[in-house]
Amino acid sequence: MSSIQGTSGSSPERLPNSREDEGMNPEGVTPSGQTISFSAVGKSTSAEDIQQLALPIIQSDAMASSPSVGGAVGEVEVAEIIADVMEKNDANVQKLDEDMEALLQAISSSEEQLESPGVRNKSALKGTNRSNSHREEIARNQRLRSLSVRHGLAYNRHSLRRLARGIRHHAGLVTASFATLHKTLRAVPQEDLKSILGKDSDTVLARLHKLGLEVNEKGEWRLRANGEVGSINQSICNLARSAERLHDDGPLSINDQASEEEVTACCSAGRRACQFLQEHLMGALRAIYYQILRFFHWISRRVEVEPEDTDYYMRPGIFINPYASYLSSSPSVEDPRSLRDRLRDGGALSGEDTLFSMPQDESLDSESVSDDDRGFQ
């Protein structure tokens, strides 16, 4: 099956190395020295297989789960917990950039092998005494049998492209929400804001400064493009654009001399790489929704100014994750609860200290949201 290998240390459990198809095994190497390779097998890949492959790289406290706050805690503890989670964003985004480089390299290698005239020929076409018509018939049958596999790869590539467009849309939502928070804070005098935040004021203001929202010498709030929000938004957009560039409108043009086994092996490797790439993009999306937007909404509630209804997913008093169905199907191994249960807990806070208030109806369910609302065009 697909394998993730490291140049030092042992390989992850239940991820055996494949030597048999080494020539057909595209791989990429991260700057840290880790080798990511995709080896094809003769069976379909399940969602559990992809999760098993993705977890060793994308799993982290900040990405795999929302901040867990138990019991009734004070304002200082809430701010410290949020600040601690936010501190991990830079490292997570950097790791995504590094891993993505290796993944894109692996996908490109897989596609080059599919189209290369130098692909090894393991088929029965090596008989030189057979007639040309017989060889052509065998080749035609092989192409027909491999067509479904090729279309499967094309479908995965198309789905990944749509996902990338949607993620770019929601990365922009973070920037728009940051601008809304900027407008909200401008309406609150500095002294009043510090009084409202109480002991949390220094912590929250320092966090806002690092995110890219600061007070200038005139006492006015100013947005900085080089803050964490701008950096994360740009990184996510770069990853999405890289994913979009991998696609064309139809199946790959495969070398006619390749056998059915070779075509299946390469297509399976490409599909695994695409699915693995989706896991990385979803990990980045978790970081956005579980950390930054919750922090913005918490501040808005503290200053008692409801955020504007600028997006379907950020209504006043409601936090809606458009990917709730997807994420709830892939829960963190550290938190077996569903996404709905985790969000309904609201961080186990009470009253005015709740990071966001959850509706009692079914508005959290994302199944009723259309593709256009999700940002998929």
Swiss-Prot record:
Residue ranges with Polar residues bias: 1-11, 31-43
Signal peptide: none
Region feature (Disordered): 1-43, 109-141, 328-377
Domain of life: Bacteria
Compositional bias (Basic and acidic residues): 334-345
Family label: Belongs to the chlamydial CPn_0499/CT_392/TC_0671 family.
Protein name, entry field: Uncharacterized protein CT_392
Organism: Chlamydia trachomatis serovar D (strain ATCC VR-885 / DSM 19411 / UW-3/Cx)
Taxonomic path: Bacteria, Pseudomonadati, Chlamydiota, Chlamydiia, Chlamydiales
